[in-house]
Amino acid sequence: MNSKLTALIFLGLIAIAYCGWINEEKIQKKIDERMGNTVLGGMAKAIVHKMAKNEFQCMANMDMLGNCEKHCQTSGEKGYCHGTKCKCGTPLSY
């Protein structure tokens, strides 16, 4: 039960950070308080960091909100999501 609650809190913190209400540093501190310096805590912190630096909302090679496409319109190229990164004019090769 405790692990399910921790996972639920973790997902809630990611959702709040994604909306921009709190920053990555505060979430990292909460993870340290709840999980400590464990392997699972390190994995959770890595996921939060990856989500926080995702500025165009590319998730799993999909442009969910069209932000990558909008970003690349300034250069006149099509936007492609590569994992969580947006690349203009570079389609996926796989």
Swiss-Prot record:
Residues 55-94 form the BetaSPN-type CS-alpha/beta domain. GO terms for molecular function: toxin activity. InterPro entries: Long_scorpion_toxin_alpha/beta. GO terms for cellular component: extracellular region; membrane; other organism cell membrane. It is found in: Secreted; Target cell membrane. Keywords: Antibiotic, Antimicrobial, Disulfide bond, Membrane, Secreted, Signal, Target cell membrane, Target membrane, Toxin. Its main location: secreted. The keyword Disulfide bond applies. Pfam families: Scorpion_toxin_alpha-beta (PF14866). The recombinantly expressed N-terminal domain (AA 20-47) induces cell membrane disruption, leakage currents and cell death on HEK293 cell line (tested at 25 uM). Does not inhibit potassium channels Shaker and Kv7.1/KCNQ1 (tested at 18 uM). The recombinantly expressed C-terminal domain (AA 48-94) induces cell membrane disruption, leakage currents and cell death on HEK293 cell line (tested at 25 uM). Moderately inhibits both potassium channels Shaker and Kv7.1/KCNQ1 (36% and 20%, respectively, when tested at 18 uM). This full-length protein shows antibacterial activity against B.subtilis and K.pneumoniae. Also shows a potent inhibitory effect on the ookinete (ED(50) 0.7 uM) and gamete (ED(50) 10 uM) stages of Plasmodium berghei development. In addition, induces cell membrane disruption, leakage currents and cell death on HEK293 cell line (tested at 25 uM). This is Scorpine. It comes from Pandinus imperator (Emperor scorpion).
